[in-house]
Amino acid sequence: VKEKSVRVCVGIFCLFLLTPAMPLRRVASAPSPETYKQDAQGLEKQFEPFLKAFQKGDDKGMDESFGVFRLPKPKEWFGNYFSVEDAAKLSSVYDREITDAESSLIEDMNRADPGSRFRVRCEPRGESGAGQDSSGGYGLRPVKPIAVEQFRLEFRSGSHDQKFSFIANFVYVDGAYRFVGGGGAAFWAKPEAGR
């Protein structure tokens, strides 16, 4: 009996040595969000799901796909760049800013060519002082510089060649451009931001 148990132990030991190591099982995690290049083509690609949803008249799809332009953690992001008081103000109005931007874009597309397939062309205007207070002291001033990238966005319909364009400001955070205001400056640098 003792000899049999020794053989079994030796057999198990040999089996252990000859068996290749089993790969460790990976824990399933949430898929990572898509990342986009930090250039005009990356921004154009970022708009594609939204433009497809618009063509289909898919309101839910438009809302979901426009979400990529939102700061992932606005309170934390504003807290990194502004005083505590200003960060609280900005994070409380940011949702309205992004919702208004989406609504305005949809209105412009409907005016230009409702239900059409649009393409966007993004022309960089460079990194500028668009994120700094350029309003004569009425806006909110960041405590450290913010790399705001400004683009001229031209939307052109595929069916009737209708087009419109505007200037928009973005920050590049976590692999995507995040909208921070239209026109010549980020929303916090405009006079109404401090009110």
Where are these predicted regions, by residue range?
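Conserved catalytic-core segments centered on acid/base and nucleophilic motifs
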Residues: F47-G57, M62-S65, V171-Y172, Y177-F179
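Short, well-ordered alpha-helical segments enriched in acidic and aromatic residues
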Residues: D59-E85
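Surface-exposed, charged secondary-structure patches
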Residues: F78-K163
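Short acidic DE-rich linear segments
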Residues: A193-R195
